[in-house]
Amino acid sequence: IDAFIQRKQPFAVYRIPGEKVPRLLTQAEGAVCLIYDLKELNGQRGFVIAPFQVSETCPVVLIQPDQWGQPLPIDNDTAEEREVALRMQGQESFLTSSTEEYASCFHTFINALRDNTFDKLVLSRHLTIDKVSGFSPLSIFRAACRRYIHSYIYLCYTPQTGIWLGSTPEIILSGEKDEWNTVALAGTQPLQDGKLPQIWDEKNRKEQA
């Protein structure tokens, strides 16, 4: 994986909830496909990297792999790679938005909601963490797979998008032919003894109502 990044070769590796082995897609030939209208995705096959809003400066990127679904074991990283992943998890030195910057953004959000410009907004903070020596995107992906066993985990790269690593328990869209499904989760609960809690607390019941 790290070699793909070094030679700027597009790829995506992902682990579906319930599966133990991630799948790897690679594109060795040609450039990725840039799409400026979601309708152009009809009939296409590949791994999609999409922004919230498609524009001329921020198109959908489609990795069209030459090789599909190669298994990628997650338990064969070295002791050194595991140590780097642990150091990244325990990193305390990072940069984030200042209180003044965050308060200004929050004020803008509140005004937009009060004016009914938007029905819902989500204000998030960003963290900038120093990269530790020996950092490996693959090691962090493997660590995420071990930690978030019920989530969809992905690591993808293209020269146009850079490196993206993500994790979500939500099914954005799944199905085939005339039957499709989606899931929207408002609640968040920590694992208990490695399993999802069977009883929801009051906070999560309200968010799902």
Name these PLM-found stretches.
Residues I1-A31, I129-V132:
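Short Lys/Arg-enriched alpha/beta "domain-start" segment
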